[in-house]
Amino acid sequence: MSTYISDRELEELGEGLTRHYLENAHVQMAARCIDIEGLANYLGMTVVFETFAEEDRDKVGFLADGRTPLKIRRKGSIVSFCFPLGTIVLDAFLRQDKESGRRRFTIAHEIAHSVSEKHNPVPQFHRIYDSEHGYTFQELKAQLTMTENQADRRAAVILMPQFTVDQALRDFN
């Protein structure tokens, strides 16, 4: 079940989470780039890379609930593998340097889901939108849910909290 959270609340929650991490991990508050994998580890999450073999090729990230299997390629075969609760699984292509922005956002997106569903973990996929793909109504409906929108919003705030944006503006003006 989705609960509506205003944009302002999402921003406060995301920024608060990032501040808490930076303060408790003894990271400089003026950091321009949030160590998103460090934040995931700080929250007790593990980030791993696998080659996805899901039918939906838009899936690039997965937040494991410890029960739901993910189809991956291992040694040339497709296997269904159950990752431990709190594991963020990223498609292996996201390791490429040119995918660093998408990799960072996907990790932040899955962190946002984890924080939102802390008391009732459910498996979550992060999908990319392919402008050349002809989506069905059901596919679009799955991508454009309130839960996904909120996770995207919170991910953006986790990566770029207002205090880092303000600092960057001061530094470059």
Over which residues does each language-model region extend?
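Active-site hotspot residues in diverse enzymes, especially metal/ion-binding acidic/histidine motifs
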Residues: 1-173
